[in-house]
Amino acid sequence: MTATSPFSPQEIAAEGIKPEEYAEIVRRLGRHPNKAELGMFGVMWSEHCCYKNSRPLLKQFPTTGPRILVGPGENAGVVDLGEGLQLAFKIESHNHPSAVEPFQGAATGVGGILRDIFTMGARPIALLNSLRFGSLEDPKTQRLFSGVVAGISHYGNCVGVPTVGGEVYFDPAYSGNPLVNVMALGLMETPEIVKSGAAGIGNPVLYVGSTTGRDGMGGASFASAELSDESIDDRPAVQVGDPFLEKSLIEACLEAFKTGAVVAAQDMGAAGITCSTSEMAAKGGVGIELDLDKIPVRETRMVPYEYLLSESQERMLFVAHQGREQELIDIFHRWGLQAVVAGTVIAEPIVRIFFQGAIAAEIPADALAENTPLYERELLAEPPEYARLAWEWSSEALPTGTTAGIEIQGNLHSWQDILLTLLNTPTIASKNWVYRQYDHQVQNNTVFLPGGADAAVVRLRPLEGQGSRGAGEQGGVNSLSGVAATVDCNPRYVYLDPYEGAKAVVAEAARNLSCVGAEPLAVTDNLNFGSPEKPIGYWQLSEACRGLAEGCRELATPVTGGNVSLYNETFDTQGNPQPIYPTPVVGMVGLIADLTKICGQGWQGVGDVIYLLGASITTLGASEYLATIHNTVAGRPPRVDFDLERRVQKVCREGIHAGSVRSAHDCAEGGLAVALAESCLAGNLGAEIHLEVSPTQLQRLDEVLFGEGGARILVSVVSTQQATWESYLQEHLGQNWQKLGIVGNTDTDLAVLTTDNQTLIRVSIEEMNDRYQNAIARRLAL
């Protein structure tokens, strides 16, 4: 191969390569790359593929544990559920594609994460999503929001995997740069977990699935750049998915894996053929030769650069045992899919690409996939000014209140009015407008409808092939067991204090699982941040990773893998970059041994006794109340007390397992008052609450009602077990619990009073329901 002429600085920059990185490429190759090779380095050395800014920080995460079977580095993490069952799970982002083409961007995000799951040999059983948008009053946000939800529902519904839960936040910080994070779970169906490292010199390399076109060109590099007003021109970088073809691909792959003829498998996601060949070769310590002329195409006159960087969807790369390739090809043809032998595993650790009989690219595999650039940036010596100023805020800056309410700018707002305002806030309000577009009951294993509990719960039914696993016959599998999953992040907490905020994310995820009776097992994380090249951006990323690592260690929930999405920024009208709130989303899974011992968040029976587990210490700093009612984003988020978190969560789980706790709900955004309202609405039952309020607290009733703090769970217990339950609480929580009141009838209100019977809130279920259920639809004028 002869050296080509140097590229112009503009051509190099267009591939997302920095000048010093290009010099390193030339040094490694001993020559200048050609156009195809330049493109290969551009995508593989992008942040999206190689994590060059975040990799040093990710090393802090705990990644091992007694149930961890596969940790970071593979397509998905895998945990042991016992009884011969193994769960694969992973979260991924599709933020930038969704910003320029919301429907396809979100749809292909679903398709991509599902491929990560079934590539391991697992059948997808559930999807969750974590979404962030700008203000819902903004017409642009309405378009993005509607498009993303439609894209998620289209792909998930068509492919036949239920979307069982998630979260949606709205904040101007995400205007123009929405976050679309999708988590998938799958139950292992193959005798062995399928890995991605190529092996066996001379083994054939198979291309299977859909055809290759020009869609998704440069998607990985696009996902590693900041968005601008011109990003709409990058629509060709957004892939187009076919969920019906993916449904066939799932079945064909699982059937193929069960033959034992597959050595390794890799999804063609970001960077397409380039990524799958280089990663499989590098992980196996071998090389791969691939002939582009063998690749099935959907467009004519494609050149190597286009083949190698295409991100056409629903494609996979297999390494097969020599002599068994036709067996696999026949399976894929029977499912109406493409399948061809396109290459070979070679001893030389090189990715060598042929096109029209000549070498089109030749690069050491580890230069693309392992030995990639690494940037260890200098951390700010002290927190940035915005954080220090925010931390100076205290509740003394707010007007004091009375039992009648609080006066804001000359107008008295009753606590009841404030509660209704918060229930009408899209971030807090019901997401039924979203959920009703998803098929959340396909596969017939969904235990709670979305919104009915603090975490999604899916029944674990024996799947085909599990009898061959160590547990013996399928009948040995406990069909009463289930898996719970949640996705969580309070981005305002993380913005105001990345370290404490990230710890709170892990704590809330575990708390949500505990509220349904699940034992938290492991984490997959999605780090959505701004530019790490800016000191504040890197400080936020570094501090959040430190907090996540500590939280996962404290709660014994190792990280099995995840995704990093940086450069999430938009430009204001003056052309200044504005980063999103730092948003480290935690996806956490938990095990439920007995599905008859679970509970949702709604009250269950008239006369049940209501308790608040945990400390009564709360803060208005970083709260939804402060942001919505006072239009102020300031203060410190609640500090996490991991010892109390562990005790409160364990008490909740054990209370559920013993049959004492009939409902459980985390006190999160909006504080105690919102949690009470949500439990009333979920159970369609009122409640009478009596709060012990000290003379000092009388002036800060907003903190009592709407203050936020960790380690707080609202539970209801059948009255006949009150004495036993309170004795149990005293033994395990000491003074860290309160009896609040009793559950009322369907026609009673939510009444919150002081212990001397002064009414703070009295509101009907009907009025709360109108605000809560219709908040999003009203803003969309639907």
Swiss-Prot record:
The gene is purL. Mg(2+) 1 binds at E92, N563. GO terms for molecular function: ATP binding; magnesium ion binding; phosphoribosylformylglycinamidine synthase activity. It comes from Nostoc sp. (strain PCC 7120 / SAG 25.82 / UTEX 2576). It is found in: Cytoplasm. Pathway: Purine metabolism; IMP biosynthesis via de novo pathway; 5-amino-1-(5-phospho-D-ribosyl)imidazole from N(2)-formyl-N(1)-(5-phospho-D-ribosyl)glycinamide: step 1/2. Its EC number is 6.3.5.3. Belongs to the FGAMS family. InterPro entries: PRibForGlyAmidine_synth_PurL, PurL_linker, PurM-like_C_dom, PurM-like_C_sf, PurM-like_N, PurM-like_N_sf. PANTHER family: PHOSPHORIBOSYLFORMYLGLYCINAMIDINE SYNTHASE SUBUNIT PURL. Its main location: cytoplasm. Substrate binds at S93, H94, N95, H96, R115, Q239, E311, S312, Q313, S565. This is Phosphoribosylformylglycinamidine synthase subunit PurL. Monomer. Part of the FGAM synthase complex composed of 1 PurL, 1 PurQ and 2 PurS subunits. It catalyses: N(2)-formyl-N(1)-(5-phospho-beta-D-ribosyl)glycinamide + L-glutamine + ATP + H2O = 2-formamido-N(1)-(5-O-phospho-beta-D-ribosyl)acetamidine + L-glutamate + ADP + phosphate + H(+). GO terms for cellular component: cytoplasm. CDD domains: PurL_repeat1, PurL_repeat2. Keywords: ATP-binding, Cytoplasm, Ligase, Magnesium, Metal-binding, Nucleotide-binding, Purine biosynthesis. It holds the Pfam family AIRS_C.
